[in-house]
Amino acid sequence: NNKTIHGITYEPFDPIKALDYVKNGRDVFIDYTAVWWAICQTNEQFVLHTEDVSKKFKELNVITMVADWTDKENWVLGDFLFEIGQSSIPSYPIILGSKNGAIKFLPAQLSPPAITPQAGKKKFIDQLELFINS
């Protein structure tokens, strides 16, 4: 099911659909998360699902997907994560269709966002802009 947050639609992650977007020149952000992992939930509440970050995704025309790894038996999510060189969550890959499919990783440690949400958002947004605009 799609989830809309501040006007941004997060589609359920599907590797084939993501790669199709990339082939068409689109940049795809993937939120690898799980409901049982507090860091994931904190990052979403104080950084990823904020109006500032949503505006930046919209401004940069980024497709957003969520890979909910709450069920660790979901081998498709696990295999894709391992294929891109990651083994743990949270993980925030962005596949840059605008840069021939280059894969970059946005920071998973967004500072202690519960204490300094502005610092976490700034760090995330700055890195997102750097990857797309450089």
Predicted features, each with a name:
Residues 1-134:
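Proteins that catalyze or organize thiol-disulfide redox chemistry
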